[in-house]
Amino acid sequence: MQQHPGNTVIVTGASSGVGLHATKALTARGWVVVMAVRDPVKAEAAVRGLRVPMEQRLIMELDLASQQSVRNFVKAFRATGRRLDA
């Protein structure tokens, strides 16, 4: 299993279903996951249940149905200074 320590990936819909399980799998391989979600409170509760380390996740609000939300997400992600690896 290839490890990716410190690399950053964005997962949309990361508060439930496939997105949440992708977050768990990616963090297990060393990725830092930007969890792009509509409801950050729901995402925090969900990820806490999976015991994903805080240093390997960043929860950010994103509603893909809203162009303004997408713009805000991009601006906020850029402000983190993180490089996007995948």
Locate each region found by the language model.
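Generic leucine side-chain signal with a strong bias for well-ordered alpha-helical environments
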Residues: 20, 26, 50, 62-64, ...
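Short, well-ordered alpha-helices that flank and scaffold nucleotide-derived cofactor binding pockets
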Residues: 24, 28, 48, 75
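Canonical Rossmann dinucleotide-binding motif of NAD(H)/NADP(H)-dependent dehydrogenases/reductases
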Residues: 2-34
